[in-house]
């Protein structure tokens, strides 16, 4: 099977690109969709990473080791990684918009429930379930964008969603770090859960109904295996999956390493000071939202190479002994990551002709 082929069993289900009712930039539907996508990116990623600045508080409250407290985050991401693949199957049968909304709403409610957990194990169960639910957001959202937004606006729209994830990741870390200075960790979790609950309602009101979605009745396992196999046989998609894996690995490792390095001598920064480094996500918000427009002007390949170059330059700068140089390096890496991530994720949607949620889940 070559990179452009698709299973014959799906040929009757494909919607002609020429006959699709695309959402175009400048319309009311596009404006509503852009705001809704920003909200879903913010809510999902703030719920994932909100516990990171709370780990010391967990250690003290439940009398556990720092290593054990990190399970509050690692369990969430582990269960998200599992459910994100399965979510593509459910959304193909149930519809994109409903799956995203239900996942967001229930995850927000679980975050509120987390503030009432009586012991450590019940908190971990809540966080694991939250990750399981949030798996229904990223891949399905990217599939909705690829199916509903006009191809010429795909990069710009994906950038709005990625900007929301950047803002959510930043506020989940920095915002919660500030809140816990004035309130208990329980109150902080409840407040964020309430905010994300409101975001989920606004998302449902704003996101236009699907126009081009082709429903697949039932949860036919053979169909989904066939789709994943088809995407994994597509060499172009494989390259995009590899880029996504490498980008995320570098980005996550950077912040983990920087936290330990800057907390030790000769910098000896406090946890609050270190958490402020995550404000560099604001560069990601800007770069991801502009990436699509810049790619239209200068070419996608040029912008992706520019993003890679920024990440390499930033990585070299983090080797400096100067604190200022390290912070600038982190800002460069963040900017480059979100440029490349935004363009790569939009390319996955464009390259996958059918079963877009399956391709997005693999990415």
Predicted features, each with a name:
Residues 17-27, 208-241:
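Juxtamembrane intracellular "pre-TM" segments in multi-pass secondary transporters
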Residues 122, 151, 160-207:
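Helix-loop-helix hairpin linking two adjacent transmembrane segments in secondary transporters
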Residues 63, 95, 116-122, 150, ...:
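Helix-breaking motifs and short loop linkers at transmembrane-helix boundaries and internal kinks
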Residues 126-167:
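Cytoplasmic helix-loop-helix junction between adjacent transmembrane helices
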Residues 82-121:
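Conserved MFS/SLC helix-loop-helix module at the cytosolic interface between two early adjacent transmembrane helices
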Residues 106, 110, 121-130, 324-332:
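Paired small-residue
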Residues 84-95, 287-299:
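Helix-to-loop junctions at the C-terminal end of transmembrane segments
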